[in-house]
Amino acid sequence: MTIFDNYEVWFVIGSQHLYGAETLRQVTQHAEHVVNALNTEAKLPCKLVLKPLGTSPDEITAICRDANYDDRCAGLVVWLHTFSPAKMWINGLSILNKPLLQFHTQFNAALPWDSIDMDFMNLNQTAHGGREFGFIGARMRQQHAVVTGHWQDKEAHTRIGAWMRQAVSKQDTRQLKVCRFGDNMREVAVTDGDKVAAQIKFGFSVNTWAVGDLVQVVNSISDGDINALIDEYESSYTLTPATRIHGDKRQNVREAARIELGMKRFLEQGGFHAFTTTFEDLHGLKQLPGLAVQRLMQQGYGFAGEGDWKTAALLRIMKVMSTGLQGGTSFMEDYTYHFEKGNDLVLGSHMLEVCPSIAVEEKPILDVQHLGIGGKEDPARLIFNTQTGPAIVASLIDLGDRYRLLVNCIDTVKTPHSLPKLPVANALWKAQPDLPTASEAWILAGGAHHTVFSHALDLNDMRQFAEIHDIEIAVIDNDTRLPAFKDALRWNEVYYGFKR
């Protein structure tokens, strides 16, 4: 079972009574056929549910009102099978607070050249019915997506499925609770921000709990529960000699298991699906949570270090969006560079907390090594390299008057040399279009040093995310040129200034 099983998307057909009962009967028949086929063949992440025809203002308004109050409804897909005068949609769209997609399709793929008549033309009017609907969306400044293509086309299936992921993610975000264990890393700017503005814009709440509250739960974990989790570690990872039974770091592994169980219990009891820690606030914990955080991220929790609640929330959102897709998604940090003409590289990592969903190894190494930062006992962690191939890194920043999402398209590569003295998980990548352009654009746009790294999602996913939440996006990819990028930032400043 996945999060998508908790939601459904309503399929709404727009028409009108002008064409008579027989035409509406055929419209309904076509709609039933299309919805059944999409649910059976399109591999959509959640179920489509056909709703009654929308043929009058009252019917349409009732559907939109019901969608708002049905917790299972993630959004609406609208198909204008015939012409549907758009003034009928104004009241409904004005109250709709769920994501909306127009599926610009028609029942037949090919025109019946020899038999086409006006009855056929009146029945199959998506071509101009969709344009009428599009006008009222533009006139009302109604954010909505459009997918054009025949309902049997696999590309259309893929695009509808991607939008569904956004719709479900948006509903999950409205319920998201972010727990901060302690506050920000002292004096750091980009990890701070306006939590009230974030809740207004995205819906997620951010609150702080004392580390002592967590410690109480951690200390209540039984030895039996720890032993069971250690057995899971033994079967899932390659343990170094120091971490095995009778190894001199075995107790550190047991303490890491205690912290993991305590953190998970605390998060479950509070209904949290994202959290932060900071190495400056660990009072009562014997080690910085490393292994615990890595495993919780793999289970779908959002996380970021040093109190960075925006990145923690973004990671959870992207975890939901990517559920069931190939490839992983993780907290990440641009750590250090390799400068080589024509082969500039970025080594990404963090002190400990990189999600094993991006690991290339089937069994990452579980080890315990010294960590000077934090002043605690040596923490347990998983060590691995990252899968190669196309990926993205994304950062959500607070500019005071708006949020900006930065996305850099990257290409992860194999580490050319072993890293015998680097005791943390890592990712190595080439930034698009090149490191000087990418880093300068990122810095000029205010991108954070913390990011969400993903093999599972791509730039199109993040564009949709920005659109569905009505936030600015700054893209850095192979098409980026710094002069044009700077101009776009200036234009955005004016545009969003007018929107205030």
Swiss-Prot record:
It is an enzyme of class 5 (isomerase). Signal peptide: none annotated. Pfam families: AraA_central (PF24856), AraA_N (PF02610), Arabinose_Iso_C (PF11762). Transmembrane segments: none annotated. One of its GO terms (biological process) is L-arabinose catabolic process to xylulose 5-phosphate. Its cofactor is Mn(2+). Binds 1 Mn(2+) ion per subunit. One of its GO terms (cellular component) is cytosol. Keywords: Arabinose catabolism, Carbohydrate metabolism, Isomerase, Manganese, Metal-binding. Mn(2+) binds at residues 306, 333, 350, 450. Gene3D superfamilies: 3.40.50.10940. Its EC number is 5.3.1.4. Pathway: Carbohydrate degradation; L-arabinose degradation via L-ribulose; D-xylulose 5-phosphate from L-arabinose (bacterial route): step 1/3. GO terms for molecular function: L-arabinose isomerase activity; manganese ion binding. InterPro entries: Ara_Isoase_C, AraA_central, AraA_N, AraA_N_sf, Fuc/Ara_isomerase_C, Fucose_isomerase_N/cen_sf, Lara_isomerase. Homohexamer. Catalyzes the conversion of L-arabinose to L-ribulose. Belongs to the arabinose isomerase family. This is L-arabinose isomerase.
